[in-house]
């Protein structure tokens, strides 16, 4: 199971719609759960922080990384911080950190971008034509 744990609520309708679209698409490939919390607490399982200082992957590399983690771990949680990022005490409990880009994105938009990248990775793993 893949859990996406994000700080704070999504406010913008267009962000919610984008997230709903990719969450629906992802159900064909994996059990993906999206959770919003005001305060982050680190659950059990393998925890990956989305952090601008984390390791960067291109889409094919991320698909390989995700496939490997899905084979090794029963539960994978990706943590997305709020406007202030992920608190240091939470980062210290994460096994790994990955970055979507060296650029900084609004935390609300990161949710859609990351869901799209998860979907893209799943289609790459299945050899489908979404990623060209």
Q: Regions from the language model: what does each represent?
A:
Residues 1-22, 26:
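N-terminal beta1-alpha1 ligand-phosphate binding loop
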Residues 8-11, 51-54, 102:
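Structured beta->alpha junctions
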Residues 16-19, 59-60, 91, 111:
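Conserved strand-to-helix beginnings and helix N-cap segments that scaffold or border functional pockets
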Residues 24-77:
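S-adenosyl-L-methionine/SAH cofactor-binding core of RNA-modifying enzymes
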Residues 81:
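Rossmann-fold NAD(P)-binding glycine/threonine-rich loop
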Residues 86-89:
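Short, glycine/polar-rich helix-capping loops at beta-to-alpha or helix-loop-helix junctions
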Residues 91-132:
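Structured adenosyl-cofactor binding patch, chiefly the S-adenosyl-L-methionine
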